[in-house]
Amino acid sequence: MINIKIGKNQYPLTLAEDHNFDWLKEVEVFTVFDQQDSGNISFGIIENGKRYFLKYAGARNLEYKGKVKDAIQRLMKAKEVYEQIQHPLLVSYINPIQMQNGFCLRFHWMDGECMHNHWDFTPFEKHHAPNSPFVKLRQLSVKERLNILTQIFEFAAYVESLGYVMVDFYDGSILYNFEQSKLTICDIDFFQKNPVFNKVGEDFWGAGRFKVPEEYELHAQITSETNVYVLAGIAFAFIGGKNDKSYEKWESTLELYNMCKKALHKEKNKRYRTVQAFYEDWLAYIGEIGGSFSQRINSISINRGENTK
């Protein structure tokens, strides 16, 4: 275990091995996220009066057990994902930074609280501590939580329209600013273009509480049906009984409950076949149809000044 200081303000950082962070010496570091099993270490910095989020691979944190070079390669692949997927809900990507001993992605800083803040809250505290972001989320009105879910599902449908599968998407990918009622998707590093296959078996990326049967199965294809399952699991976490999938714990309508139960079917061919179909049914059931799926997708593309190909 190595304790070092980084940034011009000498912010403390603990590593498994020593590493040179001189490239941060001219900026102020105001927070560090160093408990990621992906091998990344992330920083909140202030440079020229502006806040940025840096995601860095190249140093060994205390949680990562793999090879540092593999973490670097994964983050380099993630660069392409952030370049190709741009959405109003997604944390705003700026540019890559190649270091002598590592690789970094830079983003605009987004204020918000993570729905799976495991570095500050134990699993018990996550569900019971008054200041836990997840507890605060569950205290919002059902209408507010349905609105959050609708935004998440719209983002997922857009990602699908670009030919991507959302690998390792879970509540830790979700930030919420309670003061501004603003949702941010913060982590899409492992999203992949179709086709995607499980090459590692039960250790496939993903949070156990949301993982799908095929995410434990070696050589299984990871598809839109997989993503539908994960999205329904998030719905049960936000407005249901979490692991208890009974209707008694569900806080919304029977129609939405039945829809999410269908999405959680263990057999892929009995789920919704696409995120688009799941999302459109969701919109229909909550009475928020303000345009077809294609119109919503096109509006995002127009705002970006791009097409969806």
Where are these regions (language model features)?
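Conserved structural core of kinase catalytic domains
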Residues: 92-140
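ATP-binding glycine-rich loop module of kinase domains
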Residues: 30-32, 38-81
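Catalytic-loop of the protein kinase fold
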Residues: 156, 160-177
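Conserved activation segment of eukaryotic-like protein kinases, specifically the C-terminal portion
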Residues: 200-215
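Conserved C-terminal C-lobe helix
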Residues: 251-266
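Juxta-kinase regulatory segment immediately upstream of eukaryotic protein kinase catalytic domains
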Residues: 1-31
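Conserved protein kinase catalytic/activation segment
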Residues: 173-188
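Activation segment signature within eukaryotic-like protein kinase domains
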Residues: 148-149
